[in-house]
Protein backbone atom coordinates (compact mmCIF):
# COMPACT_ATOMS: atom_id res chain seq x y z
CA UNK A 1 0.00 0.00 0.00
CA UNK A 2 2.80 2.39 0.92
CA UNK A 3 4.34 1.81 -2.52
CA UNK A 4 1.11 2.65 -4.33
CA UNK A 5 0.53 6.07 -2.74
CA UNK A 6 3.68 7.72 -4.17
CA UNK A 7 2.79 6.34 -7.60
CA UNK A 8 -0.71 7.77 -7.39
CA UNK A 9 0.63 11.14 -6.25
CA UNK A 10 3.18 11.09 -9.06
CA UNK A 11 0.49 10.31 -11.61
CA UNK A 12 -1.74 13.12 -10.29
CA UNK A 13 1.13 15.60 -10.47
CA UNK A 14 1.91 14.46 -14.01
CA UNK A 15 -1.71 14.99 -15.09
CA UNK A 16 -1.82 18.45 -13.49
CA UNK A 17 1.44 19.42 -15.15
CA UNK A 18 0.20 18.21 -18.52
CA UNK A 19 -3.04 20.16 -18.09
CA UNK A 20 -1.15 23.35 -17.26
CA UNK A 21 1.14 22.83 -20.25
CA UNK A 22 -1.78 22.28 -22.66
CA UNK A 23 -3.55 25.36 -21.28
CA UNK A 24 -0.47 27.48 -21.97
CA UNK A 25 -0.19 26.03 -25.47
CA UNK A 26 -3.80 26.91 -26.23
CA UNK A 27 -3.36 30.43 -24.85
CA UNK A 28 -0.28 30.88 -27.02
CA UNK A 29 -2.17 29.60 -30.04
CA UNK A 30 -5.05 32.03 -29.48
CA UNK A 31 -2.59 34.90 -29.04
CA UNK A 32 -0.97 33.86 -32.32
CA UNK A 33 -4.32 33.78 -34.14
CA UNK A 34 -5.22 37.19 -32.76
CA UNK A 35 -1.89 38.69 -33.80
CA UNK A 36 -2.15 37.06 -37.22
CA UNK A 37 -5.65 38.26 -38.03
CA UNK A 38 -6.04 41.58 -36.19
CA UNK A 39 -3.75 44.20 -37.69
CA UNK A 40 -3.97 47.77 -36.51
CA UNK A 41 -4.23 50.66 -38.95
CA UNK A 42 -2.21 53.81 -38.45
CA UNK A 43 -3.02 57.26 -39.76
CA UNK A 44 0.25 58.29 -38.16
CA UNK A 45 3.14 56.39 -36.65
CA UNK A 46 1.54 56.40 -33.20
CA UNK A 47 -2.27 56.46 -33.38
CA UNK A 48 -3.94 53.14 -34.07
CA UNK A 49 -7.59 52.79 -35.02
CA UNK A 50 -9.65 50.26 -33.04
CA UNK A 51 -9.77 46.71 -34.36
CA UNK A 52 -12.74 44.45 -34.94
CA UNK A 53 -12.82 41.29 -32.86
CA UNK A 54 -12.38 37.99 -34.65
CA UNK A 55 -15.69 36.51 -35.81
CA UNK A 56 -16.96 33.07 -36.74
CA UNK A 57 -16.63 32.19 -40.41
CA UNK A 58 -19.07 30.53 -42.81
CA UNK A 59 -17.81 28.78 -45.94
CA UNK A 60 -19.50 28.56 -49.34
CA UNK A 61 -18.45 26.52 -52.36
CA UNK A 62 -17.39 28.51 -55.42
CA UNK A 63 -18.26 25.56 -57.63
CA UNK A 64 -21.79 24.70 -56.48
CA UNK A 65 -25.00 26.47 -55.43
CA UNK A 66 -24.87 28.86 -58.37
CA UNK A 67 -28.67 29.12 -58.27
CA UNK A 68 -28.40 30.88 -54.91
CA UNK A 69 -25.86 33.38 -56.24
CA UNK A 70 -27.99 34.11 -59.30
CA UNK A 71 -31.12 34.54 -57.18
CA UNK A 72 -29.42 37.01 -54.85
CA UNK A 73 -28.09 38.98 -57.83
CA UNK A 74 -31.23 39.17 -59.94
CA UNK A 75 -31.74 42.91 -59.39
CA UNK A 76 -32.17 44.93 -62.58
CA UNK A 77 -28.97 46.37 -64.09
CA UNK A 78 -29.01 50.15 -63.67
CA UNK A 79 -27.47 52.87 -65.90
CA UNK A 80 -24.60 55.11 -64.83
CA UNK A 81 -25.23 58.12 -62.61
CA UNK A 82 -22.30 60.25 -63.79
CA UNK A 83 -21.58 60.81 -67.46
CA UNK A 84 -18.27 61.60 -69.10
CA UNK A 85 -14.84 60.15 -68.46
CA UNK A 86 -13.47 59.10 -65.09
CA UNK A 87 -10.92 61.88 -65.31
CA UNK A 88 -13.70 64.43 -65.71
CA UNK A 89 -15.80 63.27 -62.76
CA UNK A 90 -12.92 62.27 -60.47
CA UNK A 91 -10.45 65.14 -60.69
CA UNK A 92 -11.08 67.95 -58.19
CA UNK A 93 -14.44 66.53 -57.08
CA UNK A 94 -15.69 64.44 -54.18
CA UNK A 95 -17.24 61.81 -56.45
CA UNK A 96 -14.18 59.57 -56.20
CA UNK A 97 -12.32 58.24 -53.18
CA UNK A 98 -9.28 60.38 -52.45
CA UNK A 99 -5.79 58.88 -52.64
CA UNK A 100 -2.96 58.34 -50.17
CA UNK A 101 -4.71 57.61 -46.90
CA UNK A 102 -2.32 55.84 -44.56
CA UNK A 103 -3.60 52.28 -44.22
CA UNK A 104 -1.65 49.40 -42.66
CA UNK A 105 1.73 48.62 -44.17
CA UNK A 106 3.75 45.43 -43.86
CA UNK A 107 7.31 45.28 -45.15
CA UNK A 108 8.95 41.84 -45.36
CA UNK A 109 12.74 42.03 -45.51
CA UNK A 110 15.62 39.82 -46.60
CA UNK A 111 18.58 41.83 -45.21
CA UNK A 112 21.25 39.46 -46.58
CA UNK A 113 20.27 40.65 -50.05
CA UNK A 114 19.02 44.12 -49.10
CA UNK A 115 15.52 43.37 -50.32
CA UNK A 116 12.29 44.78 -48.86
CA UNK A 117 8.83 43.99 -50.18
CA UNK A 118 5.56 45.62 -49.17
CA UNK A 119 2.77 43.03 -49.16
CA UNK A 120 -0.81 43.88 -50.14
CA UNK A 121 -3.84 41.64 -49.67
CA UNK A 122 -5.04 39.93 -52.86
CA UNK A 123 -1.68 40.45 -54.55
CA UNK A 124 0.05 37.14 -53.75
CA UNK A 125 0.71 38.29 -50.19
CA UNK A 126 0.72 34.75 -48.75
CA UNK A 127 3.16 33.30 -51.28
CA UNK A 128 5.46 36.35 -51.27
CA UNK A 129 5.59 36.38 -47.47
CA UNK A 130 6.69 32.74 -47.54
CA UNK A 131 9.41 33.49 -50.11
CA UNK A 132 10.77 36.42 -48.11
CA UNK A 133 10.77 34.23 -45.00
CA UNK A 134 12.88 31.72 -46.92
CA UNK A 135 15.32 34.45 -47.96
CA UNK A 136 15.44 35.75 -44.39
CA UNK A 137 16.38 32.42 -42.77
CA UNK A 138 17.01 29.82 -45.44
CA UNK A 139 18.42 27.02 -43.26
CA UNK A 140 15.62 27.09 -40.70
CA UNK A 141 12.95 27.47 -43.38
CA UNK A 142 14.10 24.43 -45.36
CA UNK A 143 14.60 22.35 -42.21
CA UNK A 144 11.10 23.06 -40.89
CA UNK A 145 9.59 22.58 -44.34
CA UNK A 146 11.14 19.11 -44.60
CA UNK A 147 9.86 18.18 -41.15
CA UNK A 148 6.33 19.54 -41.57
CA UNK A 149 5.73 19.73 -45.34
CA UNK A 150 4.43 23.24 -44.66
CA UNK A 151 1.32 24.66 -46.26
CA UNK A 152 1.27 28.16 -47.75
CA UNK A 153 -0.15 29.45 -44.46
CA UNK A 154 2.59 27.73 -42.43
CA UNK A 155 5.25 29.32 -44.63
CA UNK A 156 3.62 32.71 -44.34
CA UNK A 157 3.53 32.61 -40.54
CA UNK A 158 6.96 31.02 -39.88
CA UNK A 159 8.92 34.30 -39.85
CA UNK A 160 6.14 36.73 -39.01
CA UNK A 161 7.50 39.31 -36.62
CA UNK A 162 11.12 38.41 -37.28
CA UNK A 163 11.40 40.03 -40.70
CA UNK A 164 8.36 42.31 -40.67
CA UNK A 165 8.23 46.08 -40.23
CA UNK A 166 5.10 48.21 -39.95
CA UNK A 167 6.89 51.44 -40.80
CA UNK A 168 9.61 52.17 -43.31
CA UNK A 169 11.45 54.32 -40.76
CA UNK A 170 11.80 51.30 -38.46
CA UNK A 171 13.31 49.28 -41.29
CA UNK A 172 15.71 52.08 -42.20
CA UNK A 173 16.81 52.49 -38.60
CA UNK A 174 17.32 48.75 -38.04
CA UNK A 175 19.56 48.33 -41.08
CA UNK A 176 21.10 51.82 -41.17
CA UNK A 177 19.55 52.46 -44.57
CA UNK A 178 18.14 55.97 -44.38
CA UNK A 179 18.38 56.47 -48.14
CA UNK A 180 17.78 52.78 -48.98
CA UNK A 181 21.02 52.86 -50.98
CA UNK A 182 21.66 49.47 -52.52
CA UNK A 183 18.30 48.18 -51.36
CA UNK A 184 15.46 46.94 -53.52
CA UNK A 185 12.00 48.17 -52.50
CA UNK A 186 9.28 46.27 -54.33
CA UNK A 187 5.52 45.82 -54.38
CA UNK A 188 3.21 43.61 -56.42
CA UNK A 189 0.36 45.61 -57.94
CA UNK A 190 -2.83 44.27 -59.47
CA UNK A 191 -5.41 45.55 -61.92
CA UNK A 192 -8.03 47.21 -59.66
CA UNK A 193 -11.00 45.45 -61.27
CA UNK A 194 -9.33 42.04 -61.08
CA UNK A 195 -8.28 42.64 -57.47
CA UNK A 196 -11.78 43.76 -56.46
CA UNK A 197 -13.46 40.71 -58.01
CA UNK A 198 -10.94 38.38 -56.40
CA UNK A 199 -11.43 40.03 -53.01
CA UNK A 200 -15.21 40.02 -53.31
CA UNK A 201 -15.49 36.36 -54.24
CA UNK A 202 -12.96 35.37 -51.57
CA UNK A 203 -14.27 37.47 -48.66
CA UNK A 204 -18.01 37.80 -49.40
CA UNK A 205 -18.75 34.48 -51.09
CA UNK A 206 -16.14 31.81 -50.30
CA UNK A 207 -15.73 32.69 -46.63
CA UNK A 208 -17.97 35.18 -44.84
CA UNK A 209 -16.95 36.42 -41.39
CA UNK A 210 -19.32 37.42 -38.63
CA UNK A 211 -23.12 37.52 -38.32
CA UNK A 212 -23.54 40.31 -40.90
CA UNK A 213 -20.69 39.98 -43.42
CA UNK A 214 -19.88 42.32 -46.27
CA UNK A 215 -21.84 45.31 -44.96
CA UNK A 216 -24.87 43.11 -44.27
CA UNK A 217 -25.32 42.46 -48.00
CA UNK A 218 -24.94 38.68 -47.84
CA UNK A 219 -24.10 37.67 -51.44
CA UNK A 220 -25.61 40.62 -53.33
CA UNK A 221 -22.85 42.46 -55.17
CA UNK A 222 -24.89 45.60 -55.96
CA UNK A 223 -25.60 46.15 -52.27
CA UNK A 224 -21.96 45.58 -51.35
CA UNK A 225 -20.42 47.88 -53.97
CA UNK A 226 -22.75 50.81 -53.21
CA UNK A 227 -22.39 50.43 -49.44
CA UNK A 228 -18.62 49.94 -49.62
CA UNK A 229 -18.29 53.11 -51.66
CA UNK A 230 -20.20 55.02 -48.96
CA UNK A 231 -18.01 53.47 -46.24
CA UNK A 232 -14.83 54.47 -48.09
CA UNK A 233 -16.15 57.98 -48.61
CA UNK A 234 -17.09 58.53 -44.95
CA UNK A 235 -13.81 57.12 -43.68
CA UNK A 236 -11.76 59.16 -46.14
CA UNK A 237 -13.64 62.31 -45.11
CA UNK A 238 -13.03 61.65 -41.40
CA UNK A 239 -9.46 60.49 -41.97
CA UNK A 240 -10.05 57.48 -39.70
CA UNK A 241 -10.10 53.97 -41.13
CA UNK A 242 -11.84 50.99 -39.57
CA UNK A 243 -9.99 47.71 -39.39
CA UNK A 244 -12.08 44.77 -40.49
CA UNK A 245 -10.87 41.61 -42.13
CA UNK A 246 -12.87 42.57 -45.22
CA UNK A 247 -11.47 46.10 -45.42
CA UNK A 248 -7.91 44.82 -45.71
CA UNK A 249 -8.88 43.08 -48.95
CA UNK A 250 -10.67 46.07 -50.52
CA UNK A 251 -8.92 49.28 -49.50
CA UNK A 252 -7.12 50.92 -52.47
CA UNK A 253 -3.57 49.82 -53.12
CA UNK A 254 -2.36 53.43 -53.04
CA UNK A 255 -3.37 53.63 -49.36
CA UNK A 256 -0.58 51.16 -48.58
CA UNK A 257 3.18 51.01 -48.64
CA UNK A 258 3.95 54.73 -48.23
CA UNK A 259 3.14 55.19 -51.92
CA UNK A 260 2.66 58.94 -51.52
CA UNK A 261 6.25 59.57 -50.41
CA UNK A 262 8.11 56.51 -51.75
CA UNK A 263 6.56 55.91 -55.16
CA UNK A 264 9.75 56.81 -57.01
CA UNK A 265 11.76 54.33 -54.92
CA UNK A 266 9.55 51.35 -55.73
CA UNK A 267 10.01 48.66 -58.32
CA UNK A 268 6.45 47.66 -59.15
CA UNK A 269 5.83 44.05 -60.18
CA UNK A 270 2.56 43.30 -61.95
CA UNK A 271 0.42 40.49 -60.59
CA UNK A 272 -0.23 37.53 -62.83
CA UNK A 273 -2.36 34.47 -62.09
CA UNK A 274 0.28 32.59 -64.09
CA UNK A 275 3.41 33.34 -62.06
CA UNK A 276 5.68 31.75 -64.67
CA UNK A 277 5.25 34.73 -66.98
CA UNK A 278 5.84 38.44 -66.44
CA UNK A 279 5.72 38.35 -62.64
CA UNK A 280 8.53 35.81 -62.29
CA UNK A 281 10.65 37.58 -64.89
CA UNK A 282 10.34 40.90 -63.06
CA UNK A 283 10.97 39.36 -59.64
CA UNK A 284 14.00 37.37 -60.83
CA UNK A 285 15.48 40.44 -62.51
CA UNK A 286 15.52 42.14 -59.11
CA UNK A 287 16.70 39.00 -57.30
CA UNK A 288 19.70 38.46 -59.59
CA UNK A 289 20.70 42.10 -59.32
CA UNK A 290 20.62 41.77 -55.52
CA UNK A 291 22.90 38.74 -55.67
CA UNK A 292 20.57 35.83 -54.91
CA UNK A 293 22.26 32.57 -56.04
CA UNK A 294 20.65 30.51 -58.78
CA UNK A 295 20.11 27.60 -56.37
CA UNK A 296 17.87 29.78 -54.24
CA UNK A 297 16.09 31.10 -57.31
CA UNK A 298 15.25 27.52 -58.22
CA UNK A 299 13.52 27.12 -54.86
CA UNK A 300 11.62 30.39 -55.37
CA UNK A 301 10.55 29.35 -58.86
CA UNK A 302 9.22 26.12 -57.44
CA UNK A 303 7.25 28.03 -54.80
CA UNK A 304 5.73 30.32 -57.44
CA UNK A 305 4.69 27.54 -59.78
CA UNK A 306 3.77 24.50 -57.67
CA UNK A 307 0.32 24.28 -56.13
CA UNK A 308 -0.33 27.87 -57.13
CA UNK A 309 -3.97 27.37 -56.23
CA UNK A 310 -3.90 28.36 -52.56
CA UNK A 311 -6.94 27.92 -50.33
CA UNK A 312 -8.19 31.44 -51.09
CA UNK A 313 -7.59 31.43 -54.85
CA UNK A 314 -10.79 32.26 -56.71
CA UNK A 315 -9.55 32.11 -60.32
CA UNK A 316 -11.46 29.95 -62.80
CA UNK A 317 -14.31 29.15 -60.39
CA UNK A 318 -17.91 29.48 -61.69
CA UNK A 319 -18.60 32.03 -58.94
CA UNK A 320 -15.67 34.18 -60.05
CA UNK A 321 -16.79 34.06 -63.69
CA UNK A 322 -20.37 34.91 -62.73
CA UNK A 323 -19.48 38.00 -60.68
CA UNK A 324 -16.88 39.20 -63.16
CA UNK A 325 -19.47 39.10 -65.93
CA UNK A 326 -22.06 40.71 -63.66
CA UNK A 327 -19.75 43.63 -62.88
CA UNK A 328 -18.58 44.25 -66.42
CA UNK A 329 -22.13 44.15 -67.79
CA UNK A 330 -23.44 46.64 -65.21
CA UNK A 331 -22.72 50.32 -66.04
CA UNK A 332 -23.72 51.44 -62.53
CA UNK A 333 -21.56 48.92 -60.66
CA UNK A 334 -18.56 49.55 -62.89
CA UNK A 335 -18.93 53.29 -62.32
CA UNK A 336 -18.82 52.87 -58.55
CA UNK A 337 -15.84 50.53 -58.67
CA UNK A 338 -14.04 53.12 -60.81
CA UNK A 339 -15.00 55.81 -58.28
CA UNK A 340 -13.44 53.73 -55.49
CA UNK A 341 -10.23 52.81 -57.29
CA UNK A 342 -9.69 55.60 -59.82
CA UNK A 343 -6.40 56.66 -58.26
CA UNK A 344 -5.11 53.08 -58.30
CA UNK A 345 -5.66 53.04 -62.06
CA UNK A 346 -3.80 56.33 -62.49
CA UNK A 347 -0.99 55.96 -59.93
CA UNK A 348 -0.21 52.33 -60.79
CA UNK A 349 -0.66 52.88 -64.53
CA UNK A 350 -3.51 50.47 -65.28
CA UNK A 351 -5.97 51.15 -68.13
CA UNK A 352 -9.44 52.29 -67.11
CA UNK A 353 -12.39 50.12 -68.19
CA UNK A 354 -13.86 50.81 -71.61
CA UNK A 355 -16.18 53.80 -71.55
CA UNK A 356 -14.38 55.54 -68.69
UniProtKB/Swiss-Prot annotation:
It is found in: Membrane. Signal peptide: none annotated. GO terms for biological process: positive regulation of response to oxidative stress. InterPro entries: Chst-1-like, Sulfotransferase. The chain crosses the membrane at residues 8-28. Coiled coil: none annotated. It is a single-pass membrane protein. Pfam families: Sulfotransfer_2. One of its GO terms (molecular function) is chondroitin 4-sulfotransferase activity. GO terms for cellular component: membrane. Keywords: Membrane, Transmembrane, Transmembrane helix. The keyword Repressor does not apply. The keyword Cell inner membrane does not apply. To C.elegans C41C4.1 and C18B2.1. This is Uncharacterized protein C18B2.2.
